[in-house]
């Protein structure tokens, strides 16, 4: 059976022995790691351990699985690690295994402690006596890249939290001071600014000619040049939109020339339009269109071509500007004959009529 646990209290070694007991086992191997009182001439008071709990438990269970795959005869495996402050001479980690033979127990425990130091995310901080600053220590056996370790500065992360507002360690993910955080934000902003500047140079600056040396202190803001797109008046790419209806969609409009040929085209000599029919067509179509366009009829020659030309002109104006009617110089109403002015006849009195008669007689 596997016994994996992270504890905050002192580890009970007698309890570990009870977990290893089994009638079929003839050997038990126990490793106990304790806190020593010195490091490189400095007096060590205690060790402080922190861990990413969920991942640490997961990795410790994987170590147990690896042990059983290498030594199938193992009966019980115990891995207990203490978190928090561990004073001198107290146990910080206990790894034990029981098996029918001593070789499997001894080899498995040695392998387990090496894997624990290498894989499990547990960090150790040494607290020294006197004015020496505490230091976070890395495991030499760790498989993590040195770059990732150096980028995380544990010593620059003083954490002062009131006891009434204590935050669980597993919820803290950014453990840097304000200066380090500001530095990272500044680097991020500078990198984004460089990307924008590079894109502006591509969009607004001509590539330097062979004869003109490139200026080292030039930028798109001071030496920008608008590069016009093909068939466009600006540097922005313009796409043509094909409407499915309305004046721009000319394909959906009827073929007027074909319709006119069907109605007025000559089929046989006997079916040619009569003079009356020609006059009717002229009055109903040609005169209306030419009046609307502000044109006066000049000749009756090639009447169908004139109709087709006028209709094409109207279609063109509609496609360009539907409001073209409001900008024509000659309004259709101006071609109509002016209405006769209504004048009111003057009324004469009897005295005025008498004077007018006397004047005529005297002449």
UniProtKB/Swiss-Prot annotation:
One GO term describing the cellular component: ATAC complex
Domain of life of the source: Eukaryota
SUPFAM superfamilies (alphabetical): Molybdopterin synthase subunit MoaE
Enzyme Commission no: 2.8.1.12
Any one GO BP annotation for this protein: chromatin remodeling
GO molecular function terms noted in the UniProt entry: molybdopterin synthase activity
Pathway: Cofactor biosynthesis; molybdopterin biosynthesis
Principal cellular location given in the protein's record: cytoplasm
Subcellular location: Cytoplasm
More about this protein: This protein is produced by a bicistronic gene which also produces the small subunit (Mocs2A).
Family of this protein: Belongs to the MoaE family. MOCS2B subfamily.
Identification of the protein by name: Molybdopterin synthase catalytic subunit
Taxonomic lineage from the root: Eukaryota, Metazoa, Ecdysozoa, Arthropoda, Hexapoda
Name of the gene this protein is made from: Mocs2B
């Amino acid at each position: 059976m596997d016994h994996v646990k992270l504890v905050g209290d002192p580890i009970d070694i007698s309890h570990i022995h009870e977990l290893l007991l089994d009638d079929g086992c003839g050997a038990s191997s126990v490793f106990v790691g304790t806190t020593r009182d010195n490091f490189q001439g400095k007096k060590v008071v205690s060790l402080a351990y922190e861990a990413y709990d969920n991942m640490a438990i997961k990795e410790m269970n994987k170590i147990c699985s690896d042990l059983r795959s290498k030594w199938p005869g193992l009966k019980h495996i115990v891995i207990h690690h203490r978190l928090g402050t561990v004073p001198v001479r107290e146990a910080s980690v206990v790894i034990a295994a029981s098996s029918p033979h001593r070789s499997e127990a001894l080899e498995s425990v040695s392998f387990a402690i090496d894997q624990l130091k290498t894989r499990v995310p547990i960090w150790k901080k040494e607290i020294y006596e006197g004015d020496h600053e505490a230091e976070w220590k890395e495991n030499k056996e760790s498989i993590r890249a040195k770059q990732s370790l150096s980028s995380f500065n544990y010593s620059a992360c003083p954490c002062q939290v009131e006891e009434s507002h204590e935050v669980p360690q597993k919820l803290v993910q950014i453990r840097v001071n304000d200066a380090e955080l500001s530095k990272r934000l500044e680097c991020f902003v500078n990198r984004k600014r460089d990307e924008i500047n590079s894109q502006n140079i591509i969009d607004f600056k001509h590539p330097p000619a062979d004869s003109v040396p490139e200026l080292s202190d030039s930028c798109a803001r001071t030496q920008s040049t608008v590069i016009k797109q093909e068939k466009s008046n600006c540097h922005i790419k313009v796409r043509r939109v094909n409407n499915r209806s309305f004046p721009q969609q000319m394909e959906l409009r009827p073929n007027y020339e074909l319709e006119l040929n069907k109605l007025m085209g000559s089929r046989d000599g006997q079916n040619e339009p009569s003079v009356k029919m020609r006059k009717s067509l002229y009055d109903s179509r040609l005169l209306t269109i030419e009046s609307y366009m502000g044109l006066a009829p000049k000749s009756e020659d090639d009447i169908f071509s004139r109709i087709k030309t006028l209709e094409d002109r109207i279609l063109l104006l509609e496609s360009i500007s539907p409001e073209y009617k409001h900008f024509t110089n000659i309004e259709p109403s101006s071609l109509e004959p002016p209405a006769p002015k209504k004048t009111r006849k003057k009324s004469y009195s009897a005295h005025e009529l008498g004077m007018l008669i006397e004047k005529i007689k005297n002449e």
